Amino acid sequence: MFCAHLDGSPNVIGYYALQLGTDSVSELPDANKDNYLKNYVAFPALNLSFVAVDEQFQRQGLGGHLLMDVFARAAAISEHAGFYALTLTSMNADSTAFYESLNFRIYSENTKFPKMLYPLEDILTLVGAN
């Protein structure tokens, strides 16, 4: 669990948690299946399990800052553990729109709680690790 605080305050104003795991290749759109993934039933993923911003700090850019920290941490984790993409499950239309604005892509057919991903290759380019 990674927490954001205001300087000098013990109060948490935002947080996130990451978890290594797998997800089903069959849910990926064909455009996301490269030759490597076609040979497997699951793809390795770094899942953004939890992310939240305190209500009084929402819509002030903190979520974007947290996600940039997630991307930097994902790049660092990729030096020690292999995975195809950063994944998450969006919980509502507002969060889906937020993640799409950061270039996450929906890869499941569940329209209420869509699964979204950001390929590691794109993360490495974004943080300048390529």
PLM segments and residue spans:
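A short, internal acetyl-CoA/4′-phosphopantetheine-binding micro-motif in the GNAT/acyltransferase core
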Residues: 49-59
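Conserved acetyl-CoA-binding loop-helix of GNAT-fold acetyltransferases
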Residues: 59-73, 101
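Conserved active-site alpha-helix within GNAT-family acetyltransferase domains
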Residues: 75, 81, 88-109
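Short glycine/proline-centered loop/turn elements that form peptide/ligand docking sites
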Residues: 67, 92-95, 109-119
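Glycine-rich acetyl-CoA-binding "A-motif" of GNAT/NAT acetyltransferases
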Residues: 9-14
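Conserved acyl-donor/pantetheine-binding loop and adjacent beta-alpha core of acyl/acetyltransferases
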Residues: 15-50
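Cytosolic beta-strand hydrophobic patch enriched in CBS
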Residues: 1-7
